[in-house]
Amino acid sequence: CMDSSGAMRTGWVRLADGWHYFASNGAQIGGWLKDGGDWYYLDPNTGVMRTEPLELGGRHYEFNASGAWRGYEAPAGYLQPTDHITGLGGDTNTLTWGMNGVKVRIVQQRLGLWHATKLASVDAAFVSAVTNFQRRAGLSPTGVVDRATWDAMDTGYPWTVDQYQATPLPLTATRHERIEALIGYAWNQTGSSYTWGGAGPYDLGFDCSGLVLQSLYAAGLDPQPITVIKHGWPDYRTSQELYAYPYFQHVPLAARQRGDLIFYRSGGIVTHVSIYLGDDMIVHTDWMGRPARMDHITASYGWANITPDVVRPLP
């Protein structure tokens, strides 16, 4: 294949019938090609890159519009995997009344309010301690931790520390690999401390749904509009949002499988979520002073308080 000057063309070349790939010696490539971490399929006869589904060797393959092989595609109507979790831009939580999460914990630690069973929530003691700090630092004594107050505290953490998001798998990952990544992320957090409204990383702790949300990210699932920032809001309950998320499959509890999300109710309202491992075991984190860990599926709630259906994020 030559360009208009007569020079040999190599790499990806777009011709009238589609994209082709030429080796360094000018030979046209056919069959499977790995480029930049992604796999592509080029018709062995024509050399044209495939974007339509392919049946080959008794296996079904799906491709993105870019031609990259997609190792798993959810059934129609369900959340599809992604290789990039939606960016948060400048979104981060200013610590006003009722706000929760890792930034609250960091300030509590900085001001001597934190202990293992302390709720990481902006309360009266928090506001009082912050107001006193602001007076000492020559700042306006609002009791609200904004960027200026945060910087003056010199916590060692960036103002956007609550933007942490787990890194997803590439699109080539299979369903099995995604299920194991979901479980594996949560498993790797066992031993981390509990932080109300927390979504990691390990040294800053998680609550139940913060752990599950990051595990979903690791598996390549981004259930927008749920985000780690909203997770810290006073009246936002990520466990309830995940249970009600319209693009997740629900199946009966009796049909539970490894990688499903188990939900629990208190007074008829969803208040807890865990990840199912199989054999009636889960991985979760549930309250202050108790680290992320493996546990029995009932998780002190009892069978009667488990919802009758589970969420299968990877159907």
Predicted regions and their residues:
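Cysteine-nucleophile amide-bond enzymes
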Residues: 109, 128-140, 147-151, 155-170, ...
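Extracellular adhesion/carbohydrate-binding repeat motifs centered on closely spaced tryptophans
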Residues: 1-86
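N-terminal capping segments
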Residues: 158-224, 267-272, 283-285
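Acidic, Ser/Thr/Pro/Gly-enriched interdomain connector segments
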Residues: 72-120, 164-177
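Aromatic- and glycine-rich peptidoglycan recognition patches
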Residues: 234-235, 241-252, 265-315
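Short acidic, glycine/serine/threonine-rich helix-capping segments at coil-helix boundaries
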Residues: 53, 94-155, 228, 276
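Catalytic cysteine-centered active-site loop
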Residues: 193-258, 303-306
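Residue-level recognition of short, solvent-exposed, well-ordered loop/turn junctions
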Residues: 14, 34, 106, 125-128, ...
